From Swiss-Prot:
Record family assignment: Belongs to the glycosyl hydrolase 79 family.
Name this polypeptide is given: Inactive heparanase-2
Source organism of this protein record: Mus musculus (Mouse)
Gene Ontology cellular-component terms listed: extracellular matrix; extracellular region; membrane
Gene: Hpse2
Alphabetical keyword list: Extracellular matrix, Glycoprotein, Secreted, Signal
Length: 592
């Protein structure tokens, strides 16, 4: 713009300027001031780093939730846990009485605790009481002279306790155990890579320790029996299982049961295949063993715990459902996302990977509903990476994107229970490490347990979708799920709603609550990595505060950050969080 009235450098006094010129200048300055104020009023946000980022941040996502009726209702124990029988091999079973481990497990109750895995079908029960004489593997001399004696002394001390048997293991004892487990970890990995497994002995003492851990932690034990003990005609040999059933019944242990683990792999690991109809007959045989035992006459039975539903696996499931579909209380299968030997940190952010589970769910549901419509389906033994996991990846913050999306997707598609492999174990897929410290997925699971109820709600968004280019599929990098808030959480009244959101974008996203959620108070629980490692961090922060245990018997308080009513939710890039929308008075959430 040119100003037609200009002044010389040696300006005269204002009184000497022509009146028409002064008016024109005044009008021009007023116009500039008005434009400046308008600009600043409408742009109170950080300046974009580049043009692309600026365009993304202008997209405001409107979010509403259907509050009249839930679309699904899952099990109260929806998020459950698994322990692998390898803890017998590496010695960690003897430390399940640890006060710290029990505290961590109790934080995730109520839940099922499945005792099963790849070594299920190599497990034999022996009714022995002396753990020192029955433990496999000689080990170094100091293990035999000191370590084993310490275990025996610890067991004697525990036997004197009434009720829950809790131990405080000395640091030296734990350090020796970590050395032993580290050596055994190499043996276990070799077995897994070669697909050849050695036999395991479960003693009565070990079963007592396992049940004590589950009972003290508020977990319901599901025990997977060995299905590979076969008679010459390929029928199941139940002698070892019957011995275990009689012992646990004599102790009045409240246990549910399974038979076998990934039966589709039996030919490769045992040289003898078991088809679906034979496995169905084996389950009927197990049911007939349980019914005469008063303690287990009404015990739940789950199976067949198949692997990824490829063509041959679907055929096995089909044969099983024809014969024993009505025998089991829920149909179970397993899922692994990535090969742990080749995984990279960016793999955990790939939406294509997050979506692989959805197709498997539909395949399983199709077979189950053909024979037993409405039968509950469980995903057991879900892991992010195979081969025991990958250090600094499957035990890091990055793995949480897969885990949280798995929880949201399974509930949305009607899967009743998901069992996480593993709560505590060798390798790097666990929730708790071998120093008994909770890893990022533990804190994520704890938040889920505290805030998420079993009722699933439908989410409606606007401003999120865009038209794909020809030949391309748009996969959401912003994932939003909604449930009724956990009614056991006394910080929130019935009728509140909890959102959990995954932002895989490299830019922040803004979400405006609309409809029934509009102008409601919100509590934010934003979970981010803590420390210099970023996505590879094994520590997390909640709303900027690092999460650590207070002591061996106390979990930290999970403090929310209150957001004022009507405030836009801002989701930072590559993060996840929970948002409790208070006092919605949602009809779907007011009653159990």
């Amino acid at each position: 713009m040119r100003v037609l009235c200009a002044f010389p450098e040696a300006m005269a006094s204002s009184s000497s300027r022509p009146p028409s010129c002064l008016a024109l200048v005044a009008l021009f300055l007023a116009l500039l001031l008005h434009l400046s104020l308008s600009f600043h009023a409408g742009n109170r946000r950080p300046l974009p780093v580049d043009r692309a980022t600026g365009l993304k941040e202008k997209t405001l996502i409107l979010l509403d939730v259907s509050t009249k009726n839930p679309v699904r209702t899952v099990n109260e124990n929806f998020l459950s846990l698994q322990l692998d029988p390898s803890i017998i091999h590496d010695g960690w079973l003897d430390f399940l009485s640890s006060k710290r481990l029990v505290t961590l497990a109790r934080g995730l109750s109520p839940a099922f605790l499945r005792f099963g895995g790849k070594r299920t079908d190599f497990l034999q029960f022996q009714n022995l009481r002396n753990p020192a004489k029955s433990r496999g593997g000689p080990g170094p001399d100091y293990y035999l002279k000191n370590y084993e004696d310490d275990i025996v002394r610890s067991d004697v001390a525990l036997d004197k306790q009434k009720g829950c048997k809790i131990a405080q293991h000395p640091d030296v004892m734990l350090e020796l155990q970590r050395e032993k487990a580290s050596q055994m970890h190499l043996v276990l990995l070799k077995e897994q890579y070669s697909n050849t497994y050695s036999n395991l002995i479960l003693t009565a003492r070990s079963l007592d320790k396992l049940y004590n851990f589950a009972d003290c932690s508020g977990l319901h034990l599901i025990f997977a029996l060995n299905a590979l003990r076969r008679n010459p005609n390929n029928s199941w040999n139940s002698s070892s299982a019957l011995s275990l059933l009689k012992y646990s019944a004599s102790k009045k242990y409240n246990i549910s049961w399974e038979l076998g683990n990934e039966p589709n792999n039996y030919r490769s690991i045992h040289g003898r295949a078991v088809n679906g109809s034979q496995l169905g007959k084996d389950y009927i045989q197990l049911k007939s063993l349980l019914q005469p035992i008063r303690v287990y006459s009404r015990a739940s039975l789950y199976g067949p715990n198949i692997g990824r539903p490829r063509k041959n696996v679907i055929a096995l499931l089909d044969g099983f459902m024809k014969v024993a579909g009505s025998t089991v209380d829920a149909v179970t299968w397993q899922h692994c996302y990535i090969d742990g030997r080749v995984v990279k940190v960016m793999d955990f952010l790939k939406t294509r990977l997050l979506d692989t589970l959805s197709d498997q769910i539909r395949k399983i549901q199709k077979v189950v509903n053909t024979y037993t419509p409405g039968k509950k389906i469980w995903l057991e033994g879900v892991v992010t990476t195979s081969a025991g996991g990958t250090n600094n990846l499957s035990d890091s913050y990055a793995a949480g994107f897969l885990w949280l999306n798995t929880l949201g997707m399974l509930a949305n598609q009607g899967i009743d229970v998901v069992i996480r492999h593993s709560f505590f174990d060798h390798g790097y897929n666990h929730l708790v490490d071998q120093n008994f410290n909770p890893l990022p997925d533990y804190w994520l699971s704890l938040l889920y347990k505290r805030l998420i109820g079993p009722k699933v709600l439908a989410v409606h968004v606007a401003g999120l979708q865009r038209k794909p280019r020809p030949g391309r599929v748009i996969r959401d990098k912003l994932r939003i799920y909604a449930h009724c808030t956990n009614h056991h959480n006394h910080n929130y009244v019935r009728g509140s709603i909890t959102l959990f959101i995954i932002n895989l974008h490299r830019s922040r996203k803004k979400i405006k609550l609309a409809g029934t959620l509009r102008d409601k108070l919100v509590h934010q629980y934003l979970l981010q990595p803590y420390g210099q490692e970023g996505l590879k961090s094994k520590s997390v922060q909640l709303n900027g505060q690092p999460l650590v245990m207070v002591d061996d018997g106390t979990l930290p308080e999970l403090k929310p950050r209150p957001l004022r009513a009507g405030r836009t939710l801002v989701i930072p890039p590559v993060t996840m969080g929970f948002y409790v929308v208070k006092n919605v008075n949602a009809l779907a959430c007011r009653y159990r």
